[in-house]
Amino acid sequence: ILEALWNVCRLAAGDFSLITSSVRSYCRLDNTCRELPLSFDLLFRRNGFLFRYQLDVKQGAVLEENMFYGKPGSDDAGVLFARKANELHIGNEAGKMDFSTLPAGVSLLRYLDPKSSSECAKAAASWFSQVLFFREHDYKKAPDLPSEVEERQVICRLLQAMDIDILDYSITKEQGFDDPSLILTHGKADGNTFFVSFNEESTGIRKLLTLIPLVVKSLRLGSLLLADDLDNVLHPHLLRFILSLYQDHEKNPHHAQLVFTSHNTAILNPAVMRRDEICLCCRPEGTDAVLYPLSSYKKENGLIPRNDEAYGKQYLEGRYGANPRI
């Protein structure tokens, strides 16, 4: 799901691999899906606007693409663009879309201008262009960390808040090597320092060095951060700390959002996450996999989970479903 959402967002950057891959991509669990389009339906908020984006693609072509907008609490609503087959409608709020022809394999998201004079179009374009994605393999090589002093200090302070003694970092180019090396400065209790290269760090530290800059950028922009297997190789307390950054209004004044996958039940706790923030995935016998929020799940007694239940314990006991059948 996260990969699919990321590929939709990449359309705004001109990466149309989602569309071109539809020639060979379909749900292999059901042969009838071979004849159906890949369909996406996104609801999101940005700068006071509520947007709905719909996309259907099949065999390397866009069949239908729509963007609707509205302002909650007002009558301000309309269409940014609507496209079906060869019919195309561009709304007044879409701003100038600079194209003479629109190939079937190209998304209209590519032509939304983040610098548009239309606040509505600008909000929609910036949401897509600022989405970030952290994947499990991203920390296998040294990340491209910011060199600006202020950003560097923010990253190091967050690492120190997680009890990691990294005081600073530098990027050096060694003779005979094409790629620059990332060197971390560690502080010792006696006030002395020592230096460690990125490749010498533990897997957990390497993951945090790759993840935390994305967290900082997400909080600064108020953007969506997607993270696959966020809990892997991280201590549960570190995972909780990262979640707390998004839940604290002072640290997250621009309403950034974190959507992640995890197998760690330690965060399934009312003190950490609300019921509507927890989605479980299960595959009922004989049917396709389903994703459902804990806030709408009905237990055997017909009641939804209370907001004071020990979610993690109840989940492991099989009270909420979504456990593997072993």
What are these regions (language model features)?
Residues E174-V216, R220, L224-H237:
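Conserved ABC ATPase signature
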Residues R240, S244-I326:
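C-terminal lobe/lid and adjacent interdomain/linker elements of RecA-like ASCE P-loop ATPase modules
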Residues F51-Q175:
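Electropositive, glycine-dotted interaction segments
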